Structures are given as C-alpha cells and as structure tokens.
Amino acid sequence: CIRDRKYAFRKYKIKSVENNHTHLSPEELGKIESLELGGRFTKLEKTKDAFLFCCYAGLRYSDFTNLSPENIVKMHQETWLIYKSVKTNTEVRLPLYLLFEGKGIEVLNKYQDDLADFFKLRDNSNVNKELLIIAKLSGLNKRISFHTARHTNATLLIYSGVNITTVQ
C-alpha cells in the first residue's frame, strides 16, 4: 500500500466526540445549595453536600473519597485542606477559609461528628446517578456529574478574578 501510494484507511472516518465539560453558573449552584431534600430524597443529602464541598474546593471524586479528618488542618485559627492528589501524587494546600466565603467549612461543620463517614461515598457511577436526580429536583435542565463540581470551581474562581494559572 505504501509503495503504491495508496492509503489503506481512506474509507475510515475518525469520529470526534463532543467535549461535554459542564459547569454550573452561580445561579444554578444556588439552586442546589437551597434544595431541601426531605422524605424519600433524604438519602441524597450527603451526595449533595459532597458535591457542593467539591464545588467550593475543586476536588476530584478520587481525591474527595480519599480524604480523612486528618486532611482538615487548623493553622493560625484558619481551616485548610491539605491532601495528596490521587492523580498527580502532589500535595495540595487549600485555604478553605478564603474560598467562597468559607462555604466549604460550613459543609464540613455539618458532618463534624463523623467526617470520616462524610468522605465515604458510593461508587462514582451511582453518585453521578444521584446527582442527576438532585439536578432535576433543583430545577436544572443539565446533565451534571461529580466532575462538574471541579469545572464549576474553576469557572467561578476565574469569574471572580483569580488568575487562570493559579486555578490550573
């Protein structure tokens, strides 16, 4: 084929996949924040709170589920999240008290009696299914996943004037 200058794969087309990185606007995030989950949806509360915490902190699912109470550190009366990233194996230090008016700290305080349990979630696939229900109950017409939290964090930080190289 090469000698004859014929391209053996000329009939094949490479399919491109649309990049579906979704983020939430401040208004959409507010809808999830204000969602009251009662009755048969009470079991979704922890998933909602974990998602919101990751919106405020920018964590991946794998990093969140690998956290322990020891990763929440008080330094000079301020709350920090210090952990080693599962994907990159690098240490990350996040000043939770500076991010989004300390909303992440509020979530952690809600679970202060059993933070270890808060960091334990179902598998990512089931959590993502629960997030679809949460989005629908919030009135969002958007397919969100746990990774949406990370994109939401980055987008909101950039909107608020944080340098993109800092966000990366």
Where is each model-derived feature located?
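Short, charged phosphate-coordinating catalytic segments
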Residues: 3-5, 28, 54-77, 165
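Basic, Lys/Arg- and aromatic-enriched nucleic-acid-binding interface segment
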Residues: 6-61
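Generic hydrophobic alpha-helical scaffold/packing signal
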Residues: 33, 51-54, 65, 132-135, ...
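Exposed loop/turn and edge beta-strand positions of beta-sandwich/beta-sheet ligand-binding modules
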Residues: 47, 77, 90, 140, ...
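Short, cationic motifs built from Arg/Lys/His that form the positively charged side of catalytic pockets
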Residues: 59-60, 92, 150
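Short aromatic-glycine-enriched beta-strand elements
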Residues: 79-81
